[in-house]
Curated annotation (Swiss-Prot):
Superkingdom of origin: Bacteria
Keyword Ligase: no
Recorded GO CC terms: cell outer membrane
Alphabetical UniProt keywords: Cell outer membrane, Lipoprotein, Membrane, Palmitate, Signal, Virulence
Topology in the lipid bilayer: Lipid-anchor
Function of the protein: Involved in the synthesis of the type III secretion system (T3SS), also called injectisome, which is used to inject bacterial effector proteins into eukaryotic host cells. Pilot protein that is required for the proper localization of the secretin InvG/SctC in the outer membrane. Necessary for efficient adherence and entry of these organisms into cultured epithelial cells.
Compartments where located: Cell outer membrane
Name of the featured protein: SPI-1 type 3 secretion system pilotin
Gene this protein is translated from: invH
Keyword Signal: yes
A Pfam family: InvH
PROSITE patterns: PROKAR_LIPOPROTEIN
């Protein structure tokens, strides 16, 4: 299955998203839905565990489990890892959705920089901690449109 990678221009999101090639270029081999979902989950877990940054408690638990520590440390590592990977996956999907809906930010470095400036301002506002990455990006986009 041929895919190409599209890098997301978000300063918090490190990595690239797999994007299927247009159907005119190649036709991917279809897999049953359950297998595709399992493969996507496995890929995103592998991807998030290979990030250049890892939360310190996750790294600590990871090293403990690698040294064959007791079962509880190993279990905590698996839980921390899965929570981190799930949050990473959700964040990445939300950012990808936003940039698919607003491709102008992927075409212009200047527009992207303006969006990121507004994004940072939104993050610093009281009450913004409960917003998802998509809502925060959308709020920054709406502010830019109002200018």
């Amino acid at each position: 299955m041929k895919k190409f990678y599209s890098c997301l221009p978000v300063f918090l999101l490190i990595g690239c998203a797999q994007v299927p090639l247009p159907s005119s270029v190649s036709k991917p081999v279809q897999q049953p839905g359950a297998q595709q979902e399992q493969l996507a989950n496995a890929n995103s877990i592998d991807e998030c565990q290979s990030l250049p940054y890892v939360p310190s408690d996750l790294a600590k638990n990871k090293s403990l489990s690698n040294q064959n520590a007791d079962n509880s440390a190993s279990k905590n590592s698996a839980i921390s890892s899965s929570i981190f990977c799930e949050k990473y996956k959700q964040t990445k999907e939300q950012a990808l959705t936003f940039f698919q809906e607003h491709p102008q930010y992927m075409r212009s470095k200047e527009d992207e920089e303006q969006l990121m400036t507004e994004f940072k301002k939104v993050l610093l506002e009281p009450g913004s901690k409960n917003l998802s990455i998509y809502q925060t990006l959308l709020s920054a986009h709406e502010r830019l449109q109002a200018l």
